């Protein structure tokens, strides 16, 4: 969990994926669904997500990994088997998938709609929360290098949002931050 644009999706979908692949995980054993992408919109439905993952995970002794990005965009759907009005949620889907012994599940999200406390309550004793924060000065400096005092001045002014580092000019950095803060 963490604030928007703090690097959660990058850490999971790029760095952790790379780590898994470099350590022998087959690419086809890593399933990624990004609920903010139109191509994955159908998997916002918890029943569709469970169906898709269960079709891909084999009982062949191999380890599988599920990455779900932007979980706060998931849908609640009517329960077709129970007419009490209760909906099927992503909690139900993840609890179902969690029962698969050779599947590790990783979920990112950044919306107050799904508070980390609620998630930890739903999955008490069966999950770990990793909080992702903007870069510390040490992390920032390891990326920019150079004069430490100048780097600190820039860090104090622009902050530690990771994508600020990729903006080439002061104006581009300010535009990025202005847009980011207006979205929050």
Regions found by a protein language model. Give the residues of each.
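P-loop (Walker A) phosphate-binding loop of NTP-binding proteins
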Residues: 3
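Conserved glycine(s) of the Walker
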Residues: 7
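Hydrophobic positions on the alpha1 helix immediately C-terminal to the Walker A/P-loop
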Residues: 11, 15
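Short glycine-rich substrate-engagement loop in P-loop NTPases that contacts/grips substrate
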Residues: 31-64
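Structural recognition of the conserved hydrophobic beta-strand(s) that form the central parallel beta-sheet
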Residues: 67, 104-110, 131, 140
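Conserved Walker B catalytic segment
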Residues: 67, 72-106
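Short regulatory helix/loop adjacent to the ATP-binding pocket of P-loop NTPases
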Residues: 112-128, 144-145
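Interdomain hinge/linker elements that couple catalytic modules in large macromolecular machines
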Residues: 134-184
